[in-house]
């Protein structure tokens, strides 16, 4: 699917006239496209604000009152993550939710304090884990246990993850990995890793599902995941910086329903509490007694952004209409397999065993041996890292060429381009054109190299 480009947004250095033509957008892993109904949905809430102002909290002129605005979203979102309604909440943003969950679920002791996650994790996750160690007066160098890929490999092997857990089971407090790794595009074996770690009852297992939610089928409840969190602006298409979500397994819902003088504090799971997690029947009584709603809703803190919530709801209705993630995954696999096929046909594709750091081209760093190892995203690594006589990396030159020629993908330093065909709006033609322009970009680089050598 192409998206029109406004002429004022086209760089002056554009080769050829792209203005007014279509762009091939394979960047849903970074920001999903806006659903057609979203503008009308947002306008309806703006009208309610204009016409009713504060009264829309309880007497919305056309739709759900704002005091309950997030509640209709939960039944749409729960099937996407494979949770029960009471295990899911719409709230905050991804890192805010991760920090909130760590407050509740990271309970270190002198002997059991380590946090396990992958090397080269998304930086925001690293910062959250690092600061949890510091908050509990642990040395991050001893508290953080990162798992690296084997030498000359680009993704983690499940057996290596399990080995680290087994060897450190007496000192691990938390395992928290990404459902899909943001850089490599690797889809982790969530069920297998979770069940293995839970052989050791005191280990908590959480997942950052930023790149997995809305991308691949999830069954968090059945898999026994303790907690998970995600954003919604990638494959869930809710808009830039939009509201996130979290999952808390029902096995943790036994916490006391009251927190005050009359409660056994040992039954209460501490959290970053706020009035939106309180008993909604007493929320506006302004009592100095916290009675958290049972389940994930009890972890909410503040009233959510109405505009964010309705943007998410607009997109989730599309997922429901087309049979959910399981159904969309069938098309997604076809698109991504076609992408892999086209990349492997490229004259610049260098399989791992034949690749050279000095040879112009790319290799696929996403595990592609089995469809259970990847989602929509395929990551390619460009070589060589820098061209002689050029001030830019090879990846930057190729990325900019593709953008000038109407392909929107994204790049990650130092040398990776991520390509993600999304089943809700991408086509096989999008994929074909994207790889064709990638090849043209590398042709252009090759000509530049020859010109430099001849001078």
From Swiss-Prot:
The modification N6-(pyridoxal phosphate)lysine is found at residue 234. It is an enzyme of class 3 (hydrolase). GO terms for cellular component: cytoplasm. GO terms for molecular function: kynureninase activity; pyridoxal phosphate binding. Gene3D superfamilies: Aspartate Aminotransferase, domain 1 (3.90.1150.10), Type I PLP-dependent aspartate aminotransferase-like (Major domain) (3.40.640.10). Pathway: Amino-acid degradation; L-kynurenine degradation; L-alanine and anthranilate from L-kynurenine: step 1/1; Cofactor biosynthesis; NAD(+) biosynthesis; quinolinate from L-kynurenine: step 2/3. It holds the Pfam family KYNU_C. Its cofactor is pyridoxal 5'-phosphate. InterPro entries: Kynureninase, PyrdxlP-dep_Trfase, PyrdxlP-dep_Trfase_major, PyrdxlP-dep_Trfase_small. Disulfide bonds: none annotated. It is found in: Cytoplasm. Keywords: Cytoplasm, Hydrolase, Pyridine nucleotide biosynthesis, Pyridoxal phosphate. GO terms for biological process: 'de novo' NAD biosynthetic process from L-tryptophan; anthranilate metabolic process; L-kynurenine catabolic process; L-tryptophan catabolic process to kynurenine; quinolinate biosynthetic process. Belongs to the kynureninase family. Homodimer. This is Kynureninase. It comes from Vanderwaltozyma polyspora (strain ATCC 22028 / DSM 70294 / BCRC 21397 / CBS 2163 / NBRC 10782 / NRRL Y-8283 / UCD 57-17).
